């Protein structure tokens, strides 16, 4: 809040990406305003998928029951780190099936947070960070258009071009 009322220009856009971990191609993208929670575009992005999704890697902000429900309905295994103060919902003596979030909490308790991330392969999520870095390096961090619908088109075109660059060839590391 500013001294003289609300800021008029302090807004930003969030680009949500879904990456195929094998090919490193962007398979879905969604541009939202800054007041949309990160879990909101996930169902729509999953609906865009033509190939089945086996695992979903996400950062800690996606640790919500809505997301777990969405992934469970589609039969997708979530790999999302629980919040540090997370508690078990179903304990070991329950006859109900185990919840993926509870398993993540148990894993963090047993192996430590870093150990759990290594065990479940959570660091594959960094492929998305790499794609975002490549996108910003090639096209810059700003959008040219002013209207949201035009910015959505612009971001979609940028992702298509980046996919084309990816198909041409990625650097090989040894």
List where the protein language model places each region:
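Intrinsically disordered and other compositionally biased segments
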Residues: 10, 97-102, 156, 167, ...
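Polybasic low-complexity intrinsically disordered regions
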Residues: 1-83, 88, 136, 154-159
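Short, Lys/Arg-enriched charge-dense amphipathic segments
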Residues: 7-9, 78-84, 107, 165-174
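Helix-centered, glycine/charged polyanion-binding patches within enzymatic domains
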Residues: 65-136
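Basic, amphipathic alpha-helical segments enriched in Lys/Arg and hydrophobic/aromatic residues
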Residues: 114-174
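Short secondary-structure boundary micro-motifs
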Residues: 1-3, 39, 44, 102, ...
